[in-house]
Swiss-Prot record:
Coiled coil: none annotated. Forms part of the ribosomal stalk, playing a central role in the interaction of the ribosome with GTP-bound translation factors. One of its GO terms (cellular component) is large ribosomal subunit. This is Large ribosomal subunit protein uL10.
Length: 171
């Protein structure tokens, strides 16, 4: 890799760090190519990305970003999982690590907040932004639905009474 390629790699990683909502650092020592490909696929399905990066270049790219603190974690064979959704990358990495003991979660960062392995696992157990939005919409919609049911209930009961009365007269 020549100097210009390294500069491009640093610039690309820097833009990744500036746009990411969360970065998860994993140690992938002994992870097979097939397992790594499977992990990339799971990350992609979750709306996240997974990238193996040279430690020195990643440390250079971390400068002047919210994730500067994770530079200490970049030792040995590492890879970075990242996503705009603060939960997606953590959830995909933790789920994959449960089934594959070769992947070790080192830690991560959410904005300026540093996370250790337990912090990443706790983050992975939280609902995603889409799930939270769905819950909020449901909570907002519930009172309106109940009001509509209460308003239409007397008319429905009256219609049933008339229907039953008409059926009994016909019989």
């Amino acid at each position: 890799m020549d100097r210009s390629q390294k500069a491009d790699a640093v610039a690309e990683l820097n833009s990744v760090f500036n746009e990411a909502g969360v970065v998860v650092v994993t140690r992938n020592l002994g992870l097979t190519v097939a397992a790594s490909t499977e992990l990339r696929g799971k990350m992609r399905e979750a709306g996240a990305s997974y990238k193996v990066a040279k430690n020195r270049l990643a440390k250079l790219a971390l400068k002047d970003t919210d994730y500067e603190g994770i530079g200490e974690m970049l030792t040995g064979p590492i890879a970075l999982g990242y996503s705009a959704d603060p939960v997606a990358a953590a959830k995909a990495a933790v789920d994959f690590a449960k089934s594959n003991d070769r992947l070790e979660i080192v830690g991560g960062s959410m904005g300026g907040q540093m996370l250790d392995e337990a912090g990443v696992k706790a983050l992975a157990s939280m609902p995603s932004l889409d799930e939270l939005r769905g819950t909020i919409v449901g909570l907002i919609n519930a009172p309106a639905t109940k009001i509509a049911q209460v308003v239409t209930a007397p008319a429905n009961k009256l219609a049933r009474v008339f229907g039953a009365y008409g059926a009994s007269e016909a019989a």
